[in-house]
Amino acid sequence: MIIIKCGIYHLRNDDIQGDVISRYRSYNVRPLAFIFDAYVFSWFWDNMYALLVTIIVLHVLNLYLIYKICEKMGIYLSAFCLCIFALCPILVESIYWISASTRIVFSLFLCLSSIYLLLKSFDEKNDSKKLMFFYSAILLNLMCVGFYEQVIALNLFLFIFLMICLKKYKYIWIPITSTVWIGIWYVYFMMHGEMQARGALNISGMLETTVNCVKMIFTNYINAYSNFIYSLGFGKEAVLSSLVTVFVAILFVAFMIYIYKKEANLGEKSNTTRKIIFAMIWIIVPFLPFIVLDTKFIAVRNLYFCTFGIAVISEMILDLVLSLVKNDNAKNIIKTSILAFICFFFIISNIDGVNNYRKVNSIDEKVTKQIIENVPAEAFSNGKSISINYDANDLFKYKNLSIFVESTIESDWATVGKIQVMRKSTSAPTIYVNSNQDKADYVLYFDGQMNLVKN
């Protein structure tokens, strides 16, 4: 559904801007993220659909790697938590917003691949392959910390926990080395660079920041829940009025059959203590950077990691409740039915996103096209500025009501990315939205129908 939703319509591509495409600046606090933006992900610029499919494949591979790693730890994950993590609507921003997914999903893939290859090296008998797996694991681990602060923390704790479980203590130096090198990089940004706030420590205000982080996490989940419930009505209408009903029905039956067989074979195999600790690492650790570093905002995309941990804990609670059911066959049917219905409603919520994209993207396209057609070409060169002005009420009318999909034209940096995508150009003008009319080189006004009225 994410492919259908995002492949048809233009994606938000805000951070891939002219200065990132054309050159790498040493002041970027996430070193590999900006290198990959400029020299890897920019290759997909003319085919964002291909990039999105790639990200979704990585998301699925992350699920597979988590599953295989957990097997080595004596933790057996059922399809219940894996499917919830795969389809939960709250993860959509982490995936469809390419500037986030290239950091979150991709860096997690590097982290998990590093752990998986190290485990492969333990079992490999051939010496040359053993060394290849081992050194590849080290390289990927050094790379994964260069993309996102949450992955830095998760990589350290997850790796160490795994080595403790397997009693491979001598390999703990691998994540420590990765953390030290990126830590030195961040210390540099406490004193230099345009992004120095991301590298500044917040020791004195940690308690207050912790409380604020908890509030923001709960707020994001509560908002997500309310938007999820709101979107069910629109999603239901889409299902009942289109052929997608057939797709959802087939998927529903497939889940019922597949999950039933999967649950029947797993039984109660997991080391419960390890499973709880493993889940808590995913829930708590990714938020530590927000407490330690001087960052003030937790977005919906930052819930990507902890949602998996919550899915694991939720499954454990459900299993505890279902332990009251004595008949194993009935227990599996109940659990399978619950999962199938959850996935069914998740899909309906995502279907609502398709309609939201139609509405929001059509307005984004309309406004951006008018900007491009009515402003001289030199206005889009670096160093120039454009002030774009809408009536606040009119803009709100076209703004998506769901947190899962955002409008491009409501923010300056996203509008820049939209213009670049439509012009197929790396030039990056400065954009002001409803501000700096006297300062900008060009000033545009739009009416209630989002038509240009004054240039």
Regions found by a protein language model. Give the residues of each.
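Polytopic membrane enzymes that build or remodel cell-surface glycoconjugates and lipids
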Residues: 1-455
